[in-house]
């Protein structure tokens, strides 16, 4: 299924960052969010509510779009885990 259009407010980068809890747990996730959220915003601006720009653009394919929505959430989790691991490792030396 096509991911639900977040609404004109929901595509805002700041809303995306807040939703993902960017930088709230650790600052490293902020960088990931700052890369992910504007990209996501551009995607929705380009592809519109139904996920197709009408030009048959590959970027608007619902499959990668759905993956991107899920990956965004997963990305932050992974970043948090990686930073925790690095901090732990650095503390050992």
Swiss-Prot record:
One of its GO terms (cellular component) is extracellular region. Cytolysin that shows hemolytic activity (on bovine erythrocytes, HC(50)=5.75 mg/ml). This hemolytic activity is completely inhibited by small unilamelar vesicles composed of PC/PG, PC/PI and PC/PS in 1:1 molar ratios (with at least 100 mg/ml concentration). It is found in: Secreted. It comes from the Eukaryota. Belongs to the worm cytolysin family. This is Parbolysin P3. It comes from Parborlasia corrugatus. Localized within the skin and proboscis and are most readily isolated from body mucus secretions. GO terms for molecular function: toxin activity. Keywords: Cytolysis, Disulfide bond, Hemolysis, Secreted, Toxin. Disulfide bonds join 16-37, 22-33, 47-60. GO terms for biological process: killing of cells of another organism.
């Amino acid at each position: 299924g096509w991911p639900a259009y977040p609404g004109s407010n929901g595509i805002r980068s700041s809303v995306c960052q807040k939703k993902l809890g960017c930088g709230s747990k650790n600052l490293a996730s902020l960088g990931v969010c700052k890369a992910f959220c504007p990209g996501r915003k551009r995607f929705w601006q380009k592809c519109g509510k139904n996920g197709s720009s009408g030009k048959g653009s590959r970027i608007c394919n619902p499959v990668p779009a759905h993956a991107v929505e899920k990956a965004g959430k997963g990305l932050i989790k992974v970043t948090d885990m990686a930073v925790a691991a690095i901090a732990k490792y650095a503390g050992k030396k």
